[in-house]
Amino acid sequence: MLLSVALILLCGMGMSWICKKLKLPGLLGMLLTGIVLGPYVLNLLDENLLNISSELRKMALIIILMRAGLGLDISGLKKIGCPAVMMCFVPATFELLGMLVLAPRLLGLSVLEAAILGSVLAAVSPAVVVPRMVRLMEEGYGTEKGIPQLILAGASVDDVYVIVLFTTFSGIMQGKSVSVMSFLNIPISIILGMIIGLLAGWLLARYFEKVHIRDTVKILILLSISFLLVVAEDHMTTAITFSALIAVMFLGVGLQKYREVAAKRIAVKCGKMWVAAEVFLFVLVGATVNIGYLSHVGLKAVVLICGALIFRMAGVFVCLLGTDMNGKEKLFTMMAYTPKATVQAAIGGIPLALGFACGDVVLTVAVLAIVLTAPLGAFAIDSSYKKFLTKTK
């Protein structure tokens, strides 16, 4: 396993550096590293490491969401108002509707199969979007109008909404009954996640105020509590649950609100941890990609993904109607909401594992969506934000 860790870090960082020199997103190099080192090409990664790949990816996601929370300006979101709430579910709903319209015609899927495919693809990738929005906030681009805060918060909640839809549609395919409670649980889990996160942040702020410990110990405490929140959500069997990832982000928000000095120092350490976490995250996402499936994908699947993204961008545009954003800022927000990676890698293979007839198609299109949209979306954000957004002086 030590050899695998060394290969992931050295090759991942090396390929990232090469891609950046070529003016391409570094994550493209990391994804390619994972694909080449993974079980479907050279098979150089230890099987035991791949068995815990999903846990390692979740740990990396927790680190960047915590970092996002520590720097998220809630007052900026309040100023935006209703569009901030709409961004959490309207773009994903539009993309799902696009799949329902296009997938039966292009791939011959039933409406329910198209809904399952749409719910797999409709989530934006926080692993791609969140670190870039954090960088924009640090550099001051678009912050006056709350643009990076809007995208960051929406991308985090969007995943919760889509995963609940995927679970519901998969249940219908298996013949299970669907209750109204499963849909009511979407807003409830988000709100509960916010409350639990803020409460935990407040408690930690009080603790750090009374007990003086090193910042390194503080971040270890934050990470441990974040892991416990995720485990608690995974083991909940009640009808009402909470979103652990939202709780993790709002843990950072709460600490920033009640103990800002400590939050700023911890945010710096989170940023340093993300250097290694990002490499593991995208290399391991790449390792899940079976390029053999791509040989079965025709032009129709590419057209389907592009068509669904047009629906998604239309959904973002609808959310932004009535805001004070200009055309360039709206276009940037629409582009920033397109990358796919983490959710698709996590749930893309589930329909096949459950024996659904559409399983092969869903996994193939999910793989293609990662390969196409993660690097292209990252490139669109990286190359346009200085041109499209205003820097706060």
What are these regions (language model features)?
Residues 1-393:
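Transmembrane helical cores of multi-pass secondary ion antiporters/exchangers
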